[in-house]
């Protein structure tokens, strides 16, 4: 991505002199390793690396390989990564405020210089930190009180360093200083690079072609696993982390293409395997062969999931011993005597053949091995009977309500008719009485 006029150029090193230098690692991970800018419209390769869509497509027009691991790559292999794109955009909106929040004020830097003992300060390192911090303060001028205070503290420190007592004191070694290998251009611990890696890299040829050996990785870890305790103590007093820990995730990502991956553990066709053959497969993987045949099938199926998820998808896979411990924990709660794997009789299906007591079914119902399909088959007749009874009850209720309404209507009509008949009878009686009276008067 080209830099536009007036665009502010950012870099992960902006966080180096802050209270949280590990943020430089996060900043690096959200950048495209082609344009070195923040990811824009990121896409994922089949080898697990992420680049800007435009950057990687332009690169693939010239070279059909991944820029990081040199694996074969074509444009039709790219996959969209919407989540990573939104994370990068969100981070860019917060980056300026985040950097301002974690930046160390010059006054605190001066206090660190005054309070630290000569044993805890390196001769050149502290002066460089002070100068970089004074230059990093926006809007600072040479004659400002803050800058003068920092310069005065640095001057006092240089005066201490000129004394004989300071010259006799043992200076600590630099922590986590990493330099690039002139052959493979990868960063290594300086001591490890000089003593081990250069000879090995010359013998193996270029690192990209041959891959890094297990011995190199183990020996490098031995050099970096125990940093100088005195420097670690100084870093803790300043509120910082040891330098070795700052770029761990970035290095893991960049070196992901060079890690040795194990082959996929295949699924087995258990119906064609005898029990002895199944035990042999488990023994080859270092897994126990105890239990029923179904338990052994469940054991292999779950270990196959653990294996492929760990060695094929993880950027930092654990060892096989850790996988076996996870399998043991799973077996303690899941792989009991009743089978649970798909394609075979489940726990409830097995109970249909052996024990259908209510207590046994209820016990199985309360566990996470509950099989809904088998439960439906077991109680299907009862469910259908209840449904029919409910429908019949509803029909009878509706019919009863209709009959009641009809009866009410008929009774209402009958009462009206009776009232009408009674009224007519009364009217006729009245007319007859009046007629009789009129006749008597006429006589």
Curated annotation (Swiss-Prot):
Disulfide-linked positions: none
InterPro entries assigned: Rad18, Rad18_fungi, Rad18_UBZ4, SAP_dom, Znf_RING, Znf_RING/FYVE/PHD, Znf_RING_CS
Chain ranges of the SAP domain: 270-304
Zn finger intervals (UBZ4-type): 178-206
Reactions it catalyzes: S-ubiquitinyl-[E2 ubiquitin-conjugating enzyme]-L-cysteine + [acceptor protein]-L-lysine = [E2 ubiquitin-conjugating enzyme]-L-cysteine + N(6)-ubiquitinyl-[acceptor protein]-L-lysine
Function as written in the Swiss-Prot or TrEMBL entry: E3 RING-finger protein, member of the UBC2/RAD6 epistasis group. Associates to the E2 ubiquitin conjugating enzyme UBC2/RAD6 to form the UBC2-RAD18 ubiquitin ligase complex involved in postreplicative repair (PRR) of damaged DNA.
The protein, known as: Postreplication repair E3 ubiquitin-protein ligase RAD18
Species name: Eremothecium gossypii (strain ATCC 10895 / CBS 109.51 / FGSC 9923 / NRRL Y-1056)
Gene: RAD18
